[in-house]
């Protein structure tokens, strides 16, 4: 198989946009080259660490009890037992709407 590396045209193009030539970039850099094995190890280590963090958050999230939802359910049951949410009908009451008839005359 072929050697892994950047494409022949992409790296000089990116360096030209940045104002460097390929020769200048290699001369000015006093760092060692990173082998593909080291790079793959860094990427795989990052993936494993990310998965471990996600699993830890998930497992700790399942351990925490959901008290808020349980309190709401018991509170709703308590209200339902003590009083009705609806007012009982008491027949026809004209005194409730009698004020509306007097106010209607002012708007005509």
UniProtKB/Swiss-Prot annotation:
Molecular function, one GO term: signaling receptor binding
Domain ITAM: 75-103
Membrane topology listed for this record: Single-pass type I membrane protein
Annotated positions binding Ca(2+): 46
Site (Important for interaction with transmembrane receptors): 50
Transmembrane segments: 37-57
Keyword Calcium on entry: yes
Any one of the GO BP annotations: forebrain development
Function: Adapter protein which non-covalently associates with activating receptors found on the surface of a variety of immune cells to mediate signaling and cell activation following ligand binding by the receptors. TYROBP is tyrosine-phosphorylated in the ITAM domain following ligand binding by the associated receptors which leads to activation of additional tyrosine kinases and subsequent cell activation. Also has an inhibitory role in some cells. Non-covalently associates with activating receptors of the CD300 family to mediate cell activation.
Protein name: TYRO protein tyrosine kinase-binding protein
Naturally occurring in which organism (per UniProt): Sus scrofa (Pig)
